């Protein structure tokens, strides 16, 4: 495998799991490129742009959280998050078979307790399989309106969506206020994560699934008991 050296800051993020993060970086730089999951030009910035950017979500989750990473692709952000926060439970949801095969190979090789589920987050069968989650993460999967609809569908009441976004995050929120509200998303805001080791920090859109006390319950259902 191609060796991709981590930056000095990576040790503070991954601790004694840094060797596992290094091995994952090597997977991305070799099999990930060969299978079209990572562009060949991305290998020189795998750590900052992909792994550390994803691990930055660890600042915004709580111990014991059940986390679904939707449209996981090459395992971003789910695998770095699981490595940085071994006290959470991560499920990777990915519709494409070849990507699921890659994810399963990586998870098995790293020996981490991460579940891989093939399917789409909006599929009722997938929702039944994974159950209601505390947190739903995503990265480069779709527009904010779609992400909110998919995420709210598998979140428990009060659960949170954490969507890694770019410079237009605030504008996306404003453009999609009505759709977000219809999806049952409340308390929508932008977070900056990883400021101690990323320049610029990761931009994350956070939203909560409404509860009967602060808005609508599950989208499409009455919140009355």
Swiss-Prot record:
Binding-site residues for S-adenosyl-L-methionine, renumbered to this chain: 71, 76, 121-122, 139
Pfam families: GidB
GO cellular component assignments: cytosol
Record has Cytoplasm as a keyword: yes
Subcellular location: Cytoplasm
Disulfide bond residue pairs: none
Keywords: Cytoplasm, Methyltransferase, rRNA processing, S-adenosyl-L-methionine, Transferase
Enzyme class: transferase
Parts forming coiled coils: none
EC number per UniProt: 2.1.1.-
Region (Disordered): 204-225
InterPro entries: rRNA_ssu_MeTfrase_G, SAM-dependent_MTases_sf
CDD domains: AdoMet_MTases
A GO term, aspect molecular function: rRNA (guanine-N7-)-methyltransferase activity
Function: Specifically methylates the N7 position of guanine in position 518 of 16S rRNA.
UniProt family annotation: Belongs to the methyltransferase superfamily. RNA methyltransferase RsmG family.
Name assigned to this protein: Ribosomal RNA small subunit methyltransferase G
Organism: Mycobacterium sp. (strain KMS)
């Amino acid at each position: 495998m191609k060796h991709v050296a981590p930056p000095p800051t990576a040790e503070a993020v991954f601790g004694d799991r840094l060797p596992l993060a290094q091995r994952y970086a090597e997977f991305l730089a070799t099999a990930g490129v060969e299978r079209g999951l990572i562009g060949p030009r991305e290998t020189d910035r795998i750590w900052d742009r992909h792994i550390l950017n994803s691990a930055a979500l660890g600042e915004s989750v709580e111990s014991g959280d059940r986390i679904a990473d939707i449209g996981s692709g090459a395992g971003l952000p789910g695998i770095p998050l699981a490595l940085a926060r071994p006290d959470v439970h991560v499920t990777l949801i990915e519709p494409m078979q070849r990507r699921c095969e890659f994810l399963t190979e990586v998870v098995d090789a790293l020996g981490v307790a991460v579940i891989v589920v093939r399917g789409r987050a909006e599929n009722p069968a997938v929702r039944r399989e994974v159950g209601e989650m505390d947190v739903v993460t995503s990265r480069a999967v779709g527009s904010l309106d779609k992400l909110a609809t998919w995420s709210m569908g598998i979140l428990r009441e009060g659960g949170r969506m954490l969507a890694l976004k770019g410079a237009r995050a605030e504008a996306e929120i404003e453009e999609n206020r009505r759709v977000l509200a219809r999806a049952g998303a409340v308390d929508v805001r932008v977070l900056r994560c990883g400021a101690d080791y990323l320049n610029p920090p990761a931009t994350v859109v956070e939203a909560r699934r409404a509860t009967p006390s602060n808005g609508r319950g599950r989208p499409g259902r009455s919140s009355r008991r």
